[in-house]
């Protein structure tokens, strides 16, 4: 009895523990970078609101800014057609950035997002973990409302996230996770009203739908009809033509209920209207469709409809069943759905039908079909229907035999986990890597955003699976600095893969660091280079000179003719070597020209580094991020990137190399960017692990105790 009192199950406390466990769990997989143009655009607006108190987009224009979707406002200034809600969600990220800016005495970056520092990107990349956690606990509560027991609701709500296409959107910086989490909450609160008959649930349902309205774009109208129908089906409204008084009473009740819901929606509708009026002079205009160009017909051509709907459902590259295999349970066991689920079956089916039709026929331009969700992992536009269809799947699961669970449900869960792990571990952008820009079928041109969706060998899951196995095979080369802790930490391009070996492109000034191993001290250091011709007409010889620990090694200077390889055996006294952090500076110039680089003509490759006759690994990725905050707070000094080379696009390209060629996890970033503050990241990583373990343990205790008492 005493034990039961001490461990009394408290639903609200459990929900809080479950929320924080999911928050820390999803945060663990965050990127540490903003990985979408949409995300940068929303974040740019947040920074403008916070620092400059305006909705106007940054005035900096290309080439010093990343391209954004812009539209002229009523005042002639440029604005984004994006929603306000997701920009407000980035306020913690900008406040975190502002804290570091004040500590470092720096002004906010003017050319954001091209020049963006790590604090704001780190926290921004974790934003959707918060909304993912909201969605999980909402699904848990939703499932319990169908009398699915605590343990099973817990298991299924978590599976609903990690084995479906929802998982990657707790990571990728798009507004869809915020949209779907509050939409699911709005539907759940309608169900709560039908069960408890408390008007407050209608009001809070309206509040949740109000958040949906301001989150993203005008697609908030798509769920409106299923939302209203769900209310009518849940409340079992039945009009009788012969009973006028009864009909009036029912209609009066509907109006009263609608009023409570409208009270919740109203403040957000006013915010939405004011936001649009300030920008575009019209309360209902969000900027979409106001740009110049050919006006698209209301009804698209038949090929658009057929191709889009088929693509959403069955294409090898973007089928919703490939990215969320669990949806197949609805086709395998639809006959197990109970009659009591009629409100959910009808409303959720209508919602799915609307999205399949509307997304399937969606066109961004006359020759651009956008049904596939554009640049994303899976179809981001279609994730809205996943939580609702999963509620039906969870009810089916209740009726399954052990055989069906092990041989149907479980395999689909595992396949889904694998597919989502590809989108979690790697940036989704690299699925297009090494693909030709266009292919031609007769007179039709298909770009790399189209044909991989229809040809299986180029599909994202197939292509990224090959990347996974290759990356795992090569993982030692990415992180192993060897016995001498060798790092090509500045002025070297990413490894150029020739198949049998990899070379490193060398900038005009490059730096290598290494330690002097106590067991096998360095007495011989040799570097081999190639002066590679990119075009035959460029025939400049290259001179390479060396400086070790601030001492010039004049006798080691070499001159390499065009299209030749040559070794440089460094001549130095072992007395100048330190036990740790020896710095070798490599200077390159071309004889007969004042150009430090001959882009698209010639390049210098480092082929091999040998220490004491043994080849060393030169494939680790060690770069400066070029962080003004780190420079001020930690006294970081930059040599090539951030000093000699300050072109923002060149530095952006450095970030892109690390982003594309490493595992996409925030806590791995300091292993590649040596100017990231390792103490800050270590503390955050430790807190992340502690959060997962602490709240995971709380949940485990709840499960054990609940299992004994049920």
Q: Language model features by range: what are they?
A:
Residues 2-499, 544, 625-710:
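Membrane-proximal envelope and lipid/glycan-remodeling enzymes
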Residues 475-679:
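Basic, ligand-binding patches in group-transfer machinery
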